[in-house]
């Protein structure tokens, strides 16, 4: 059990006076740290410090607020655990948020680790609003080849050269120590490799990869692998997030960021992977996202196996990657996850800001899946553009080349990638500063080969109403450069005391961002209806009508929404609704006539308001379409189809066998040239109100063509109409030897037979249904067609 001690105790005499036994050997032995110290679970008010010694000793941490200007006046604090062990885990609690601490570890008789590398900065509160620096990478701890070892070394060195002053979070993306995540591999390829200048002050939050589970044959089921012995992660909701009660997956909050760490390879209950909706992990993920919805501005999820990847692993062909994409991407879309970080593929890949893609790579559509058509780069180069006002969509980053670097021979990156690199390793450094995220992929040669920036909740227009002479502070909606329209530069706020109505704007130096502040100074209260100009509104559709007020508070009054007549006059307005907040949500009645000069007007329940109606807009009605005239037509080489449209043009329509077309006309005659019996059927009609109604008069039938009766005087057929049998008489001098064919009016053949006769031939037609048919007789010297009717 831990106990707090607030002064150092000298034990020299006590130790020397005791008999030397096994319990005291650790105190008298020349103890040495063989691993660490390293930081775990660094949060707002606490941290876990771990280390390993060569012999069992007690565990003592001495810590203090780092205040360079206090002359060392504060008293260090001590956390002591007298239990003798080689695996030391000490938790510090009650720390101040957003504060730098220094620490040493050892025993009451001997410090074992101290110096400039051993410090940490606690997490800020959600309102502290300082930049959070994050380092992410996967597939890094591998010294099995010279290429991997050199790559890992170069990536580390370039991180140290390019990192910010302090790295708050180090995200491990799985396959952290090759080949199998054993204790000696973690020791040699992570703890020894990265050393105290990183591990002594940078808290890591890991996920396992498949290689962590390769340590044992049963690890996926029983979880008895070294990885879980190395880590101390927040499983009980200690740092926010939903408790998972397992080290396999967990979540936590860090300032305004919600981070979820998942296990994409272990098995729940010995059979369910993360992608299986029956797994506890899948269900926990959904519940955690639901519980955190709206509480953090940013959501980041880490796990090993990527849903989109090419050229190292292939997410088209590997079943576990397909399953993850199909099962998890809809969840990420639903909860508007901002960033997914993966490893597994030994490359770097960064996708569009995208949503809705669960199929194979060839189904990715540039016009469908990206939610913003931008490359994410915040720079004045070519078509570069950052992601502005990100809402829906997720960026997927594969950061799996911090050690291993492999190419499967496929030259083509995944179609969703904005940038992809298989030729050089690197790691991802990114900073979240309030509503701005800036990421850099720093390659092993120090070149920043990819970067992207995401802004949320920027480019705002704010309307302010002031008393005359009142001072107001205007603050921009982003972090970065600022050029104010009143000449102030390089600060994110200004304070002004306007004496008249004015508009103040602020832009960034690159021209992507702009806030507008519309300031009204006194006098008369005004209510403005802010419906867009020249839009077309469909009846029976929900309409949002926003409004605002000047020179008063909106919530002080009740308001009613009125509609003008079709000429824009409010002589006899139609009352549409009442509310005390903006916007109005209404549905226009389908009894309203079409018109292009309607206006909305919002009125307050006081007679001294100036009322500014909306600009003119149009009211439109849904489309409907049907044929007029004959619905059955005899065959001709050119026929006319008559159409009648109702609703607001233009109309887009589709008729069987004819191309889709658009018209402004409400009455339309179409010239068609059939070549056989056909049914012209209206398939659909649309206008700006969407899919319209196809009326019951939706089809015109054209009868089968009749050939020229070149020899009709030489052959007769009777009776007509017929009952069960017809007689064919030959009035020529030659016998008729050929074929007899009967077709219905749609051109479908119902009978064909060979005939050979001199004077007459009887044909039995009792099997035919009642209707109209075309009979054709062909021989070497004769062709004859005639319409017959079967009763």
Roles of regions detected by a PLM:
Residues 478-483, 555-559, 647-654:
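Solvent-exposed loop segments of extracellular immunoglobulin-like
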Residues 17, 27-142, 146, 153, ...:
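Acidic, histidine-bearing metal-coordination/catalytic regions of metal-dependent phosphoesterases
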Residues 459-461, 522-532, 620-623, 697-718, ...:
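Residue-level detector of functionally pivotal "anchor" positions at catalytic/ligand-binding pockets or at interdomain
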Residues 105-115, 119, 181-295, 314-322, ...:
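Extended active-site neighborhood of metal-dependent phosphoesterases/phosphodiesterases
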Residues 48-50, 469-477, 542-547, 637-645, ...:
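A short beta-strand segment in extracellular, disulfide-stabilized domains
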Residues 485-496, 570-577, 658-670:
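Surface-exposed, flexible coil segments in extracellular/virion-facing regions
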Residues 492-505, 585-592, 662-680:
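Solvent-exposed segments in extracellular or luminal domains encompassing
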Residues 21-26, 483, 558, 710-718, ...:
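C-terminal outer-membrane/trafficking sorting elements
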């Amino acid at each position: 059990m831990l106990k707090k001690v607030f002064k150092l105790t000298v034990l020299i005499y006590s130790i020397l006076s005791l008999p030397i036994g096994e319990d005291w050997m650790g105190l008298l032995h020349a103890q040495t740290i063989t691993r660490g110290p390293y930081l775990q679970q660094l949060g707002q008010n606490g941290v876990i410090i771990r280390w390993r010694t060569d012999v069992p000793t007690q565990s003592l941490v001495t810590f203090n607020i780092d205040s360079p200007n206090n002359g060392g006046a504060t008293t260090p604090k001590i956390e002591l655990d007298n239990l003798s062990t080689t695996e030391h885990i000490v938790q510090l609690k009650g720390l101040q948020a957003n504060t730098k601490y220094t620490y040493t570890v050892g025993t009451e008789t001997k410090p074992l680790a101290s110096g400039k590398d051993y410090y940490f900065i606690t997490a800020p509160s959600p309102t502290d609003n300082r930049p959070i620096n994050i380092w992410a990478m996967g597939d890094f701890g591998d010294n099995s080849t010279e290429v991997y070892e050199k790559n890992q070394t170069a990536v580390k060195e370039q991180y140290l050269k390019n990192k910010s002053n302090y790295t708050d979070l180090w995200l491990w993306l799985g396959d952290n120590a090759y080949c199998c995540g054993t204790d000696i591999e973690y020791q040699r390829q992570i703890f020894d490799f990265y050393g105290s200048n990183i591990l002594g002050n940078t808290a890591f939050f890991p996920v396992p990869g498949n290689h962590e589970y390769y340590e044992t044959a049963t690890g996926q089921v029983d979880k008895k692998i070294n990885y879980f012995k190395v880590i101390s992660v927040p499983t009980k909701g200690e740092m926010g997030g939903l408790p998972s009660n397992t080290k396999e997956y967990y979540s936590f909050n860090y300032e305004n960021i919600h981070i979820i760490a998942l296990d994409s390879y272990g098995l729940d209950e010995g059979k369910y992977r993360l992608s299986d909706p029956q797994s506890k992990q899948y269900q926990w993920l959904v519940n955690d996202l639901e519980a955190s919805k709206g509480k953090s501005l940013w959501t980041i999820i880490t796990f090993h196996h990527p849903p989109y990847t090419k050229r190292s692993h292939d997410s088209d062909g590997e079943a576990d990657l397909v399953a993850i994409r199909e099962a998890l991407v809809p969840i990420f879309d639903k909860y508007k996850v901002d960033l997914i970080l993966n490893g597994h593929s030994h490359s770097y890949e960064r996708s569009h800001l995208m949503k809705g893609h669960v199929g194979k790579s060839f189904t990715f559509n540039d016009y469908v899946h990206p939610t913003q058509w931008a490359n994410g780069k915040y720079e004045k180069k070519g078509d570069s553009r950052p992601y502005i006002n990100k809402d829906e969509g997720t960026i997927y980053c594969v950061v799996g080349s911090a050690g291993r670097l492999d190419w499967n021979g496929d030259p083509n990156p995944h179609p969703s990638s904005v940038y992809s690199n298989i030729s050089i390793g690197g790691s991802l450094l990114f900073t979240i500063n309030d509503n701005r995220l800036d990421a850099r992929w720093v390659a092993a040669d120090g070149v920043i080969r990819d970067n992207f920036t995401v802004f949320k909740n920027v480019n705002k227009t704010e309307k302010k109403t002031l008393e005359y002479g009142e001072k107001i502070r205007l603050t921009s909606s982003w972090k970065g450069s600022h050029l104010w329209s009143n000449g102030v530069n390089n600060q994110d706020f200004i304070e002004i005391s306007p004496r008249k109505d004015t508009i103040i704007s602020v832009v960034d130096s690159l021209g992507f961002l702009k806030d507008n502040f519309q300031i009204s100074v006194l006098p008369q209260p005004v209510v403005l209806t802010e419906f867009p100009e020249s839009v077309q509104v469909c009846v029976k559709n929900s309409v949002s009508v926003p409004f605002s007020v000047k020179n008063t508070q909106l919530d002080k009054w009740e308001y009613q929404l009125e509609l003008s007549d079709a000429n824009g006059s409010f002589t006899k307005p139609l009352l549409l609704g009442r509310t005390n907040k903006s916007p109005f949500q209404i549905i226009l009645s389908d009894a309203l006539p079409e018109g292009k000069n309607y206006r909305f007007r919002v009125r307050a329940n006081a007679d001294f308001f100036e009322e500014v109606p909306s600009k003119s807009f149009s009211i439109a009605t849904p489309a409907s379409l049907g044929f007029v005239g004959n619905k059955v037509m005899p065959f001709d080489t050119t026929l006319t189809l008559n159409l009648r449209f109702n609703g607001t043009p233009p109309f887009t329509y589709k008729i069987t066998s004819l191309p889709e077309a658009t018209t402004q006309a409400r009455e339309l005659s179409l010239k068609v040239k059939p070549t056989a019996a056909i049914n012209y059927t209206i398939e659909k009609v649309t206008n700006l109100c969407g899919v319209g109604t196809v009326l019951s008069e939706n089809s015109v039938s054209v009868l089968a063509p009749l050939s020229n009766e070149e020899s009709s005087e030489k052959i007769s057929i009777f009776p007509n109409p017929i009952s069960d049998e017809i007689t064919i008489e030959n009035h020529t001098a030659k016998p008729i030897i050929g074929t007899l064919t009967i077709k219905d009016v749609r051109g479908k053949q119902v009978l064909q037979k060979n005939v050979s006769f001199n004077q007459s031939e009887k044909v039995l037609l009792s099997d035919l249904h009642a209707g109209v048919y075309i009979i054709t007789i062909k021989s070497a010297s004769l062709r004859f067609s005639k319409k017959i009717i079967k009763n």
